[in-house]
Every structure is written in C-alpha cells, then in structure tokens.
Amino acid sequence: MAKRDYYEVLGVSKGASADEIKKGFRTKAKELHPDRNADNPEAESQFKEANEAYDVLKDADKKAAYDRFGHAAFDGGMAGGPRGGGGQGQGDFASAFSDVFEDLFGDFMGGQRGRPGGARTQATRGSDLRYNLSITLEDAYNGLSKQITVPSSVACSSCDGTGSEAGAEPTSCPTCSGMGKVRAQQGFFTVERTCPTCNGMGQIVKNPCRTCGGAGRQEKDRALSVNIPAGVETGTRIRLSGEGEAGLRGGPAGDLYIFVEVQDHALFQRDGMDLFCRVPVSMVSAALGGEIEVPSIDGGRSRVRVPEGSQSGRQMRLRGKGMPALRGPGLGEMYIELMVETPVNLTGDQAELLRQFEESCKKTNNPNASGFFDKVKSFWDKVRD
C-alpha cells in the first residue's frame, strides 16, 4: 500500500515551519496514543505512521531530501540518501516521540528528564504554607499589624540544615547515581520514577543528625508579625517570602501565604468598596420627612435627611463613607436603605386615631395601593367575562 504524504499525516502544509510541524505531531500523538484508543485497532498503526513522518520532517536534511524525492529518498533506492536504505528502526521511532515527550508530559513528570549530567542536588526547597487569618470589618477598613503563630518546619539548629552530624558528608546514591530518579524502558516510552533508595534526594546521609534524623529540619512554632493593609477583603492573599517550611538539607525555605477572611458585620454589608446599611424609620418620619442619624465604619456618625413620602427600600448614598481601595487612593460609598417600620402594640386610643386617619385618606395618599387594587378589579372583571 502506498505511503501517505508525511505532511498530510501530521495535518500541516508543505510550507509549515518547524514549530508547526512539532505542534502537528503533538496533536496527532495525543489523539492517536494507544492508551487512549484501546478500542481502535487502527490507532496504533496511525500512531507509528505519525512518528515516522515526524522523524523525517523534524530533521532539516531528511526534510530537504523528502521534499525533493518523496518517499523514494528513504526506501533504499536513492544512493547517498540520508538513510542509505533499510527503513526506519525502533531507535528513531522512539527518538521522534522522545523529542515531544517532555512537552506532552513534562509538567506531570516535574519538568525533569533525568538526562546524564543532570544529577540532583541534595538541597530541596521547602514547601509553601497557608495561614487563614480572620479579621473584623473595622480592621479591614483601618489596616493593622497582627502577631500570628505559625507551626512549621525550621532548619535544624544542631546540623544547620545539612542533615548530617558534624563533619559527616553525604554520599551519592548508588541506586540512581545521584540523579534522584530511576528510569525504566516500557516499549517506546521511558518512564521516570523517584528513586526508592534516596527518596529523590540524589544523596544518602550515612551519619544522620541525631536531632532531625537527617531531614535537616525540625518542627517548631514561629511568631511572625503580619502587616494587613487597609482595604483587604475575604480572599485577599498576602505573600511572605521565605517564611514557609525550611528546605531539606540546606535548601531555601518556601513562602508563607496569608489568606484573609473578613468577618460579617452586625450593621454593614460589603460589596467591594461599597457598604450597605439598613436603617429603620418610623411611619411618621417616612411620611412627613425628617433627619436620622446613621453610623459609619470609621466610628463616626452622619446626619441623613429622609425625604417626605419615603417608602421602604429607598436608598440614599453617602459619598466617601465606604471602604478604602486596597491599592491606591479613594474610598467607596455607603448606601442607606430605609425600612419603614409599622407600629405595633398600639393602645386603644392609638388604634382609633389610625382608623380616623385611614378614613380621611384619599387615593392620592396611597397611590401604590390604589393602583394595585384597580389592577386586581380589572383582572377579576376579565375572569368573569
């Protein structure tokens, strides 16, 4: 059966660049990988076909020969061809896939291939830590400096983080030759695993520190001072560089991340930089108008005029009475929402006065109620018809 055009196999044009050819192969490799196509018997042959095409097109000399002579350049019929006949062997097939193996799976494998000369050092960076800090809304408005206690691993005081007793030197791991990983060939794939002897460190401590057992660090609570800027909100993350766990055997420390949680407030609800406050007003004040006093987050008070005829839910804005910006100048707004309170626990005289008031009211005194009942009457009339 005639071979397919290599460019067609990879789904690229004949004028494709090296990056486009590599991208085309990566796409095909993911699509046709046997592990993803167990129920497709043709996938394996197509997978090999894609590898064969990439092995030629990735190489400038082979690509030039293919562009000039086609498949004849590699079938043994062209004297002086780049392969000299004989077809492609398994070594080239594995090599072709190896070129993009790290692109496909590099992040999963930790980004290290364990090539010769790439031996790992025993020093390993410490882990990052998370600390959840709960503060009040007032703290978020003003900002504060707070002392916290963080349980973490710190450099061992006995061995200064080396993991070895004084004067003892670690030796290269005999299992992985200092690589920290061992490799195993599985078909066309080379699989890397953490060395079971040194746990990926690449070195073995023959005379470990008695205090830390060779880890180079020990558990200890640390007191830290954290500066919380004004304007933070729930979810704000503050990074303290080098305040995480100590590194293994002299490695650099990780970072500490403070995650802020702002507590709910009894008076204010927050939306970004804006604050909302629901304020009850009497029925008389809402009807006749007047002034009310409202609190502000800075501890002060503000006088607010209630317009005549105000209804429940009416909002009024106080400029500059909200939360500060986390970065840069500026303050948000505070919105006052009126809640008209219906009187309760009335005396007989009070109830009678309200009845007299009700009898004296006209439709214009209660436009919403009048309009609503007019709509109800119209609805019932239509239902009867």
Curated annotation (Swiss-Prot):
Q: Where is the J domain?
A: 5-70
Q: Could you state one GO cellular component term attached to this entry?
A: cytoplasm
Output this protein's name.
Chaperone protein DnaJ
Q: Which organism is it from?
A: Jannaschia sp. (strain CCS1)
Q: Name one GO molecular function term.
A: heat shock protein binding
Q: Which UniProt keywords apply?
A: Chaperone, Cytoplasm, DNA replication, Metal-binding, Repeat, Stress response, Zinc, Zinc-finger
Q: Which cofactor does it need?
A: Zn(2+)
Localization of this protein: Cytoplasm
Task: Provide the residue positions that the database annotates as binding Zn(2+) 1.
Answer: 156, 159, 209, 212
Name any one Pfam family assigned in the record.
DnaJ_CXXCXGXG
Q: Where are the CXXCXGXG motif repeats?
A: 156-163, 173-180, 195-202, 209-216
Q: Which GO terms describe its biological process?
A: chaperone cofactor-dependent protein refolding; DNA replication; protein refolding; response to heat
InterPro entries xref list? DnaJ, DnaJ_C, DnaJ_domain, DnaJ_domain_CS, HSP40/DnaJ_pept-bd, HSP_DnaJ_Cys-rich_dom, HSP_DnaJ_Cys-rich_dom_sf, J_dom_sf
- Report the stretches of sequence that form zinc fingers (CR-type): 143-221
Co-factor note (free text): Binds 2 Zn(2+) ions per monomer.
Q: What is this protein for, i.e. what is its function?
A: Participates actively in the response to hyperosmotic and heat shock by preventing the aggregation of stress-denatured proteins and by disaggregating proteins, also in an autonomous, DnaK-independent fashion. Unfolded proteins bind initially to DnaJ; upon interaction with the DnaJ-bound protein, DnaK hydrolyzes its bound ATP, resulting in the formation of a stable complex. GrpE releases ADP from DnaK; ATP binding to DnaK triggers the release of the substrate protein, thus completing the reaction cycle.
Domain comment from the record reads as follows: The J domain is necessary and sufficient to stimulate DnaK ATPase activity. Zinc center 1 plays an important role in the autonomous, DnaK-independent chaperone activity of DnaJ. Zinc center 2 is essential for interaction with DnaK and for DnaJ activity.
CDD domains documented for this protein: DnaJ (cd06257), DnaJ_C (cd10747), DnaJ_zf (cd10719)
**Assembly description:** Homodimer.
Give the family this protein belongs to, as stated in its UniProt record: Belongs to the DnaJ family.
The residues listed in the UniProt record as binding Zn(2+) 2, with positions renumbered to this chain, are 173, 176, 195, 198
